[in-house]
Regions:
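Active-site helix of classical SDR
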Residues: 122, 166, 174
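Short C-terminal tail/terminal secondary-structure segment
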Residues: 235, 246-267
């Protein structure tokens, strides 16, 4: 099937909870070999301990902001499954920024966590994908990289200054890497999401129950999506069904980013 990922090997970061965990579990259920990476070893063990180290799923704990940890993750994946076909950069952090405080370090932290980690891992994995494809015949796909972004990349909320900058940077990285890797038959795409019940959104709604109604009211489809709906978009971009798609940022937000907050006409 064009959308099948059976037999493919994927690295999924941010796999200890939320969207990353949903991607990892669903990919494994649909026949992919999955290396689940996260710095939260305790949570990885709690979520995956019963199935890891057997069958088609493994987990790797480490701080991917460190270059050596990235190299070790790639090596561990090759040791376990021989090849790498798919990378899903789902590791992300949401942090508020004080736009008027020059001592605030959230922008630097979020650029390092949400952008630079994804870039460095993509570079390492792409090198492995290129090496693998050198020994193959034909002009089939060499690999697919999917970055998880946010509609915050195109919205202006001062309290999310750092997160928005990092998300916008991730999308530009996606486009630039898509051009750099296209000659090697590696596709690079992103999914920008909003109005999806991620771990961070669930936590926020728990603290502010009134936000659920506000989100649903201001989302044209009048609901919050399940993580599975986002996973399906990621699988599409990982599969051969999207074989001619690269450099794209797919928006999965129920139409939320299409709305103008001002109802009065502009002219």
């Amino acid at each position: 099937m064009a959308f099948s990922i059976t037999g493919k090997t994927a690295i999924v970061t941010g796999a200890a909870n939320g969207i990353g965990l949903a991607v990892a579990r669903t990919f494994a259920d649909r026949g992919a070999n999955v290396m689940c990476a996260d710095m939260d070893e305790k949570r990885l063990a709690e979520e995956l301990g019963d199935v890891a180290d057997e069958g088609n799923i493994r987990y790797f704990a480490g701080d991917l902001r460190q270059r050596l940890t990235i190299a070790n993750l790639v090596s561990a994946t090759i040791d376990a499954f021989d090849e790498i076909d798919i990378l899903v950069n789902a590791s992300r952090q949401v942090m508020e920024t004080d736009a008027l405080n020059p001592e605030d370090t959230s922008v630097e932290q979020l650029l390092e966590q949400n952008l630079m980690t994804a870039l460095r891992l993509s570079q390492q994995v792409a090198r492995r994908m290129i090496k693998q494809s050198d020994g193959r015949e034909g002009d089939g796909p060499a690999g697919s990289i999917i970055n998880l972004s946010s509609i915050a990349a195109h919205q202006t909320r001062p309290e999310l200054l750092g997160y928005s900058i990092a998300s916008a940077g991730l999308e530009q990285m996606t486009r630039s890497m898509a051009l750099a890797l296209a000659p090697h038959r590696i596709r690079v795409n992103a999914v920008a999401f909003g109005s999806v019940m991620s771990a961070s959104l669930k936590s926020s709604i728990g603290d502010h129950p009134e936000w659920r109604e506000e989100i649903e009211t201001r989302t044209p489809m009048h609901r919050i999506a399940s993580p599975t709906e986002l996973v399906d978009a990621v699988q599409f971009l990982a599969s051969e069904g999207s074989g001619f798609v690269t450099g794209d940022v797919m928006t999965v937000d129920g139409g939320r980013s299409l709305l103008d907050p001002v109802s009065a006409p502009a002219h």
